[in-house]
Amino acid sequence: MTRIFGSVLADSATIEAFERLMALATITTPNVPELEALGGKAAMAHRNVAYLAKGGDAEGPEVEDRMVRPGHDDVVWRAPRIETRHTHGTGCTLSSAIATLLAKGQPLEEAIDGARKFVRAALEAAPGFGAGHGPMGHQAVR
């Protein structure tokens, strides 16, 4: 898939494998470039899978994440963009937090809401290490 600066992390064979895994997953969490690599919203609708389209890579003062599930209305979360360069690991953190909250028995929508709050708190608590896209402040979130 992709990461900061659009560098490709997966070739077409890897994307094909990912497509097979999406059919088994409760939800997938593509960012804007990943959603495009998977064929966009129309292709995802054709696959009949649930996904959370993350808006952190989009432009604008607000971040919008949209949960799309077959047979359900979309659920949208919006929040002011946190201006920081310490965004390394946001996607992995969000996915891991969703999985953790689902494993604790939370319904999907609540798990996503809680995971988004965790990521926002970690962004706000970033320790300021390194140059470029530094790490988030996971340690500050309890």
Task: State what each model feature region is.
Residues R3-F5:
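Conserved beta-loop-beta/alpha segment of the NTase-like Rossmann-fold superfamily
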Residues S7-D74, E83:
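Conserved phosphate/ATP/ADP-binding segment of small-molecule kinases
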Residues L9, W77, M136:
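Short clusters of hydrophobic/aromatic residues that line enzyme substrate/ligand-binding pockets
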Residues D57-A58, G91-T93, A97, G134, ...:
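Gly/Ser/Thr-rich beta-alpha loop segments that engage phosphate groups in nucleotides
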Residues V75-R78, A121:
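A structural signal for small-residue-enriched, beta-sheet-centric alpha/beta enzyme cores
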Residues R85-L108:
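Short, small-residue alpha-helix embedded
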Residues E109-R142:
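Charged C-terminal helix
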